[in-house]
Amino acid sequence: MAEVADHVPNVASTLIDTLIASNRGDRHAFSYNDKRYSYQDVAALMNRTGNLLHGLGLEAGSRVLLLLPASPARVAGMLGAIKAGMVPVLGAPAQALEHCIAIVKPAAAIVHQKYLQEAEAALAALPRDAVVVVGSDVRGHKSFVDEVRGQPSWLAAPDVRADAPALGFWTGAAVALMSHAELAAFVHGTGDLPGGGDAPNPAAAAIGAMLRAFARGEDATLA
C-alpha cells in the first residue's frame, strides 16, 4: 500500500493567521497608493478572497490564474487561493496567454482591467462567471471589489498534503509549481522560488521577498 504523504498546516494560514493569533495583526504589512495595510487588513482580504473563490464553485486543488500587477488584489488572490486549498498561478500578460491557459487549465481567473483587452480572447476558454476583474471597467465580468466586499472575513484553513501544489508561476512555456512543504521552507529562508528558465516570471523575485517579510511579520515591499 502506498504511503500517504504527511499533512501540514496551510502555508497562507501560518504566514498571516499566526500573526493575528499572537496579537501582531496591527503591524504594518505594506503600503499602496498612500494607504497603509496592517496584517489584520491582509488577513481580511485573504479570507474574503478565499470565500469568493469557494463561491465560484472552486474546490481544493483548483488552479486560479492571476493576471495582476503588484497590488493588494494580487496579495489577496495569491494568499486567499492558497488558504482555500487552491493553487494560484501567477501569469504574465505578455507571455502567450492562450498557451498559458491551455497548460494551466485554470478554473477561474482574477484579472486587472488594464490587462483585460489583451487577455479577453484567451479568457474566453473559461466560463464568463469564472473571470473576476479588478478595476472599474469589468466589461460584463464580475467585479473583484464588489464580490469581495460581500464575503465573510473569516475562512477556515484545511490542512493540506505536504506534496500538494501551493503556488505556481507561468514561465512562458510551462508552470513552475511549489508544494506546500517547499513553500513553507522557502518563506523561512530555505530554497528559491521557481519561475526561471528562458522566460522567467517577472513577479517571482518580488513575491518571494514579500512572503519572507510576511513570515517575519515585517514591513514588506508590495509585490
Each predicted region: which residue ranges?
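AMP-dependent adenylate-forming
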Residues: L15-Y39, V134-S136, P165-A174
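AMP-binding/adenylate-forming domain of the ANL superfamily
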Residues: E3-H28, A44-L45, R63
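AMP-binding (ANL) adenylation modules
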Residues: T18-S22, L56, P69-P72, D198-A205
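ANL superfamily adenylate-forming
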Residues: K114-G189
